[in-house]
A protein has these predicted regions:
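N-terminal segment of the mature folded domain
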Residues: 71-121
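N-terminal secretory signal peptides and thylakoid transit peptides that target proteins
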Residues: 1-16
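Short, well-ordered beta-strand elements
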Residues: 31-43, 63-66, 142-146
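Short helix-initiation/N-cap motifs at beta->coil->alpha
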Residues: 42, 65-76, 174-186
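C-terminal motif of bacterial Sec signal peptides marking the signal peptidase cleavage site
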Residues: 22-23
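Ligand-binding pocket segment of bilobal, Venus flytrap-like solute-binding proteins
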Residues: 83-87, 157-221
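A conserved helix-loop-strand patch within extracytoplasmic ligand-binding domains
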Residues: 104-151
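Ligand-binding cleft/hinge of the Venus flytrap
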Residues: 52-59, 138-175
């Protein structure tokens, strides 16, 4: 799957945001308020939001954190100026559909991580090395790929690109959606039981540090 950038996205109407991230003087920013949007189930985005909050408040801004349920709601808020900044955007791949829709009203303020990547991953003990190996383990996997939220970009890409590319769209396979935390819980249970499991993951994400997992090869670059 494709590599992307993790960036800061801002509402064009919020001229204060660019100054905040450029560390302008407190005297210029004192009293101004920034609304930072995030999705609480996406822990990497939560971390970036709080780090951004600390930095902009050092420069005299006040902040409001707004927890939104889905990326579509977040990007709608950005486009309307209800949200000033989203600190964990994936503009080229994961959130491309929203940038295509709202891009004229949203400004990309720059990248903080240049090698973000969407993957399907397995525990290190897995007999699978490639996505192409998955059909041979259908019974062990119960014909399921364990995913995250239904509205997530990786879910859409998994269903619309990866499944068709590898013949997993015949009606017997499912990308199971629920939440990021539910996916991590299923991963942990499978590892504890030494069972096969395939989950949708991405870099950077803390699960790679906590669990002994590895990415499946994607020879078709789906």
């Amino acid at each position: 799957m494709q590599t992307s950038r993790r960036t800061f996205n801002a509402a064009l109407a919020s001229l204060a945001v660019g100054s905040a991230l450029a560390a302008c003087s407190g005297s210029r920013s004192k009293g101004k308020k920034l609304t930072l949007g995030f999705i609480s189930s996406w822990t990497d985005g939560v971390c970036m939001t709080h780090l951004t909050k600390i930095q902009v408040e050092k420069n005299g801004y006040t902040t409001e954190l707004k927890d939104l349920s889905e990326p579509s709601v977040l990007y709608t808020g950005l486009s309307k100026g209800d949200i000033d900044l989203y600190a964990s955007a994936w503009p080229e791949v994961t959130h491309k559909q929203y940038m295509d829709q709202y891009g004229e009203s949203i400004e990309d303020l720059g990248s903080y991580y240049g090698s973000a990547k969407l993957t399907w991953a397995v525990p290190s003990y897995s007999a699978m090395n490639s996505i192409a190996d998955i059909p041979g383990h259908a019974d062990e996997l119960d014909h399921k790929i364990i995913g995250i939220e239904d509205g997530a970009g990786i879910t859409q890409i998994s269903k619309e690109k990866v499944q068709p590319a590898y013949g997993l769209d015949d009606g017997t396979w499912e990308v199971k959606t629920s939440s990021t935390q539910a996916m991590v819980t299923e991963l942990e249970k499978a590892i504890d039981a030494q069972k096969e499991i395939v989950v949708t993951l991405w870099h950077p994400f803390w699960a790679y540090n906590k669990y002994d997992v590895r990415d499946l090869e994607d020879p078709l670059n789906a």
